[in-house]
Amino acid sequence: MQTRSTAKALCQIGLLAVLITVSAMFKLPSILPGMEFQISAPIAVAICGVFGIRTYILAGLVSSAVGLLLGTQNILNVGISLLFRIAVAAVFFFSGPNRFFYLFSGPIGTFFARIALSAVVGKAAWGLVAAAVPGMVFTLLTAGFCGKVLGLARKAVLERENASVRHPLQENNVR
């Protein structure tokens, strides 16, 4: 059974990585060029809340690797997104999957990522944070909804999986 659970975990991480990667290609526009906000932020928060830190970080690493391979991200993008993920995971670690987590982990992660970005590029930190405020509000408003949707999807998959498991001694064990 270990092989089945490993294969299931690999598939789950791969699918979540694809979800992060594809949603990162959609961005909320910004007044300043280059300051767009990725739609993947609330989805990433939801993945952490529903699937836990380990799965979230692994899916994020795979997503970043895919972005590098496709050329849609560079090392700076990957570093900033990893900082966002670490901040979200830290909030999850200390608060769990509650309302506070879904409301504030995304904006906290974005805040720390923008502060780090300002240190790297040498621009005013508060200007970068101010440019991200619309995206932070978007994440604050939508992460809980994304978490509900992912939670319902996970629950349906688990119920389907449990319903399809039959015991060898059970009568009418036909598939």
Cite the ranges covered by each PLM segment.
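Loop-helix junctions at membrane interfaces
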Residues: 1-175
